[in-house]
A protein has these predicted regions:
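Internal helix-turn-beta structural module
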Residues: 73, 78-151
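Conserved mixed alpha/beta catalytic, RNA-binding, or beta-rich assembly cores of soluble enzyme
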Residues: 1, 15-19, 24-78
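Glycine-rich, mobile lid/loop segments that gate access to catalytic sites or pores
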Residues: 1-18, 120-121, 137, 142, ...
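Short, ordered loop/turn segments at secondary-structure junctions
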Residues: 12, 38, 52, 83-86, ...
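Structured core elements
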Residues: 6-9, 16, 25, 32-34, ...
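Generic structural signal for short, flexible, solvent-exposed coil/loop and linker residues
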Residues: 4-6, 15, 20-22, 36, ...
Length: 151
């Protein structure tokens, strides 16, 4: 039995679209490589083949930005940020930062001054200004040659 405060069952309504018209992405390849290798857990959604309105891609970029910001702020050795979204819900259902092994609930604290909705992420990271084909070759993170706001 799964116990939770809230159960979200098809919060966006009927799921009638599929393929390239929906949230499927093109290939789904290189998931682990695109997300730091095997050291960082991934949700299974690919970046390439999806536009940045999909939180598989933009949420990962925002998690990276938040992790780097918290790393600098706390002068930490390691920060991992986990964001979880439900289809049809604009805000994340979970936002957790693990800072040097200690967990912090980012939704119930004053750690964040970020809008974590897809629209908020788009604006905060300036995602309208990038040509994402540039990221498909050498990765999505740590690309100082592309001056991405989340790198």
């Amino acid at each position: 039995t799964v116990k939770a405060d809230t159960y979200l069952i098809n919060p966006a309504g009927d799921w009638t679209l599929g393929g390239l018209d929906a949230d499927s992405g093109l290939s789904g390849r290189k998931l682990v490589v695109d997300a730091y290798g095997p050291n960082v857990p991934i949700g299974g959604g690919s970046f390439s083949g999806k536009d940045y309105t999909k939180v598989d891609r933009s949420g990962a970029y925002m998690a990276r930005k938040i992790a780097v910001d918290l790393l600098k702020y706390h002068h930490s050795q390691e920060v991992m940020v986990k964001l979880a979204y439900a289809i049809g819900i604009a805000e994340p259902v979970m936002a957790l930062a693990i800072i040097d092994g200690e967990g912090h609930d980012l939704l119930s604290s004053n750690y964040l001054d970020y809008d974590l909705s897809p629209q908020g992420i788009r604006l905060a990271l300036g995602l309208d200004n990038y040509h994402f084909v540039d990221f498909s070759t050498w990765g999505h993170f740590g690309r100082h040659d592309l001056s991405a706001s989340w790198c």
